[in-house]
Design a protein with these regions (language model features):
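Metal-dependent nuclease catalytic cores that hydrolyze phosphodiester bonds in DNA/RNA
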Residues: 25-30, 34-146
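Mg2+/Mn2+-dependent nuclease catalytic core
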Residues: 125-217
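Conserved pre-motif I regulatory segment
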Residues: 236-278
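A substrate-engagement module of RecA-like helicase motors
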Residues: 241-242, 248, 301-411, 416-419, ...
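Walker A/P-loop
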Residues: 271-292
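A contiguous, basic/glycine-rich beta-loop/short-helix subdomain that forms a polymer-engagement track
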Residues: 386-411, 422-429, 521-638, 646-647, ...
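Signature of the SF2 helicase/ATPase Hel1-core->accessory helical subdomain module
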Residues: 393-410, 415-516, 597-611, 750-752
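Conserved RecA-like P-loop NTPase helicase motor core
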Residues: 635-646, 696-805
Length: 821
């Protein structure tokens, strides 16, 4: 089914005609396949949450694998069928302490061990309805009692379980009941829901007798609902595939280098490879990666394409590129979805996510079918489009978008939707066994973003504040945690210290705290408040990361004194090498393409991101000539911290001389806000006639846009910004909107104990502590900032690299080859 992963490192470098593509005999999409049903079976397996449910075993997933001899056109899991057709009522995200996967498995075994000797577990059942084949495994069947059981494990009070959850459980056991009646030719059967409390180990059994005819009617009703949807999806996928196979490049010609990029992406997905593509800013990377991936989708049987970005502007560029494609092919039936953060999509941030609090959660699942259908008939679902559909049907835009992610063809989202430990898109892909392609935009950001995803921290000051207001039932647990916390840093004299291992006694106290808080929330759901709940989630995250701790993490304690006798500390589990977590997510996709203007040196990214050994690398030729960009190294000025005061006047005069020689719009980048302010103050004193505007700390999106709006075709002035911030990458100011950049820093990270510890670890792991911690990330930011200047074939501009270290050979060799220094 999959194309072989043969080596193609050399092949990817060699240009091919992107419109003369190798053909593959079979083409299969989830929900659709344009080949006879006898050749391939489509697996439909939907989950209503972002996580793989512990109740679905690996054995069950294997049982749902396509059977080449099966004549059914659709294969669906029992649970997936019921989640699609039987969910009703409110969206309710109130705290419910669920058992872990291990606890759930243990609970099932305990229940089974209590049954009679003839009791059967994991009973495989299957049946058909028209073109559907339904499969699953019932938890248990007792032939002596003629009783089929569905076992559900839980914590806390069973009465707290929402009614719509139990309704879904009954739907599952009824479908299993009909499949059993059909398989054993039974006229009736006892169906039982067995709720097992994993703490008390008590069972609550809810039993009802059903006739086979009643169960058959129920089964057929739900299958008919699902089949209608599945046939609609088949029609959509067939039309989409045909249109994508005929898709033409939306412009009259490729830019220089853009064709090489597109060909390489196509070959990477055709051979099931990971591709790292370094391509200069302005080449058209977004459309140069999206187009070939869409073109390859039919032959490579891709279910979805994920376009992942680090920042909001990246999502906009992807939407713009898809708009160009859609405009050039107006008949193209392509469902495009933009996923945004919950706080940006929430219509009622002051309300809780449940039907008693939020009107858009009330009856969410009752209105979901109509909202889902409406969303998919208006296939352009950016944030505004999704909001419009959701509000028209009175459902939550954020959770509707998560549902539509199951049916979209292209999903544009932040990195964390795929790479985070609980990422929605990765979880859905694994559960549904989707065949996906992943495009990672501005991939130079992946190292730092991934480190953040797989790190966790706790602040003792938050614990202290919590102890002042926590309920009596939690005081003893919190006091014990605080004692263990104090013991951790009691002997630490330095403000910062790293440790080789995680603290065992502290983690034990932390786990007891998790258990106690979970039990309290379950007994007192009305007691949930921002501080208590936030601390609970922070603790859970810390415990989870602690379980992953190895040599690729650093555990450190940062102390701060409140008085001569009292101090607080902050504990941090810092991931420094995310390769262990990134690599499985890259290899799980049919193809992962990471692209950026700055992916050098290769070994830096290969080491830290865990790239597969057969990853293909390309360095795309710049579409711009050396004459377009005048790059000057100003080596007479040092911007080192010790020389900062002396650098102010020379930098101001340099900016003024360039502005007077060629008036226009410029960006000036500095290493910090303080440095920026010092230069700006002197600039305004010395040259008040030169307009300037500054980046401020914590700017909102509207404020950032206001900063950029100052750069017009008619304006003149200098925008001051911090290197590595919002304006150092991902912004597009073509033509006269920006004609030059001054970069008064090498971009090196701040010298502090944390970075020095990182440097030590990088030296141990890779033998290049300074380079991996300071030099490579710093120069990367410089090149990104310089890339803002030349955006088109007609642009002309200047970049001034202000620091004597830019003249060093080790630094110069990291700069783009096409620059004329």
């Amino acid at each position: 089914m999959f194309a072989s992963r043969q080596s193609c490192a050399a092949e990817v470098e060699r240009p091919i005609d992107p419109f003369v593509f190798a053909r593959y005999d079979r083409c299969c999409y989830l929900y659709a396949h344009p080949v006879p049903a006898s050749q391939v079976v489509t697996v439909i397996s939907l989950s209503s949450s972002s996580e793989i449910k512990p109740e679905v075993s690996a054995e069950e997933l294997r049982s749902l694998a396509p059977d080449p001899t099966d004549q059914a056109r659709y294969l669906v899991a029992v649970r997936a069928l019921c989640e699609f057709t039987a969910k009703a009522g409110d969206l309710d995200l109130r705290f419910t302490p669920s058992p872990t996967a291990q606890e759930g498995i243990a609970g099932h075994r305990t229940v089974a061990a209590r049954r009679s000797p003839g009791y059967q577990t994991e009973v495989s059942l299957s049946g058909e309805y028209q073109q559907l084949k339904i499969r699953g495994r019932a938890d248990g069947y007792d032939p002596a009692l003629n009783q089929l059981e569905e076992i559900k494990t839980y914590r806390g009070e069973l009465s707290a379980m929402p009614d719509n959850h139990r309704q879904l459980h009954w739907a599952q056991v009824k479908v299993y009941g009909w499949l059993l009646c059909q398989q054993l030719q039974l006229d009736e059967v006892n169906l039982a829901l067995v709720y097992f409390n994993i703490v008390s180990e008590q069972e609550t059994l809810i039993r009802e007798r059903f006739s086979a005819l009643t169960l058959q009617t129920f089964f057929q009703q739900h299958c008919a609902i699902f089949l209608q949807w599945a046939e609609q999806e088949l029609m959509h996928a067939g039309e989409r595939n045909q249109q994508l196979s005929q898709l033409k490049f939306p412009h009259t010609s490729f830019r220089t280098g853009q064709r090489h990029l597109a060909e390489s992406v196509y070959k990477a997905v055709s051979t099931g490879r990971c591709l790292m593509a370094q391509a200069p800013t302005g080449i058209g990377k977004t459309i140069g990666t999206l187009f070939p991936m869409l073109k390859a989708a039919p032959t490579q049987k891709l279910d979805k394409v994920f376009f992942l970005t680090a920042k909001t502007p990246g999502r906009k560029l992807a939407l713009d590129a898809l708009t160009v494609i859609r405009t050039s092919a107006p008949e193209l039936k392509l469902r495009v979805l933009e996923l945004v953060a919950r706080d940006k999509a929430c219509e009622h941030p002051d309300k809780a996510c449940n039907g008693d609090s939020c009107p858009l959660a009330k009856g969410f699942y009752d209105r979901l079918p109509a909202a889902r259908s409406a969303a998919l008939t208006a296939p352009w679902l950016d944030q505004a489009g999704m909001r419009e559909v959701a509000l028209a049907h009175e459902v939550c835009p954020y959770y509707l978008s998560q549902e539509i992610a199951r049916w979209a063809d292209v999903v544009i989202a932040d990195y964390n939707y795929y790479f985070d430990l609980s990422g929605l898109l990765f979880g859905l892909s694994q559960f549904n066994q989707w065949r996906v392609a992943v495009l990672v935009d501005e991939a130079h950001n992946m190292v730092e973003r991934a480190r953040q995803m797989y790190s966790a921290s706790l602040d003792q000051q938050n614990l202290n504040a919590l102890r002042q207001t926590a309920p009596e039932a939690l005081q003893k647990t919190l006091q014990r945690l605080n004692r263990e916390w104090n013991a951790l840093h009691k002997e630490q004299l330095a403000p910062y210290q790293a440790y080789p291992e995680t603290p065992g006694k502290f983690l034990l106290a932390l786990n007891l705290c998790v258990s106690a808080m979970g039990d309290y929330f379950n007994d007192h759901p009305q007691a949930l408040n921002g501080g208590l709940q936030s601390f609970y989630f922070e603790v859970i995250a810390f415990v989870r990361i602690a379980e992953l701790f190895d040599e690729h993490f650093v555990f450190d304690i940062s102390k701060r004194a409140l008085s001569s006798k009292r101090s607080y500390s902050r504990l941090c589990l810092r991931n420094v090498v995310p390769a262990r977590f990134i690599r499985p997510r890259l290899t799980a996709a049919r193809s992962s393409v990471l692209f950026s203007a700055t992916l050098s040196p290769r070994h830096y990214y290969a080491d830290l991101l865990g790239l597969p050994a057969d990853t293909a690398w390309i360095d795309v030729e710049s579409p711009f000539s050396r004459e377009q960009l005048d790059v000057q190294i100003i080596s007479r000025i040092s911007t080192r911290f010790t020389h900062r005061q002396a650098s102010l006047a020379p930098i101001v005069e340099l900016l003024a001389e360039q502005f007077q020689a060629r008036p226009g719009n410029y960006l000036a980048f500095f290493s910090s806000f303080d440095y920026q302010q010092q230069v700006a103050d002197l600039m305004q004193q010395s040259h008040p006639h030169i307009p300037l505007w500054q980046q401020a700390r914590g700017m909102s999106e509207s404020e950032r846009q206001g900063f950029l709006d100052r750069f017009t075709l008619e304006s003149q002035g200098i925008g001051f910004a911090v290197l590595g911030g919002a304006f150092g990458e991902g912004i597009d100011l073509p033509g006269a909107r920006l004609i030059g950049a001054f970069i008064a820093t090498l971009g090196l990270a701040q010298l502090n104990p944390v970075n020095e510890q990182l440097k030590q670890r990088m030296a141990v792991l890779f033998g290049a502590g300074y380079d991996y911690t300071y030099l490579f990330p710093g120069v990367q930011k410089v090149v990104q900032a310089a890339g803002r200047v030349i955006r088109g074939q007609q642009d002309r501009g200047v970049v001034m690299l202000i620091d004597d270290r830019f003249a060093e050979p080790k630094v110069r060799q990291l700069l783009p080859r096409w620059w004329q220094l």
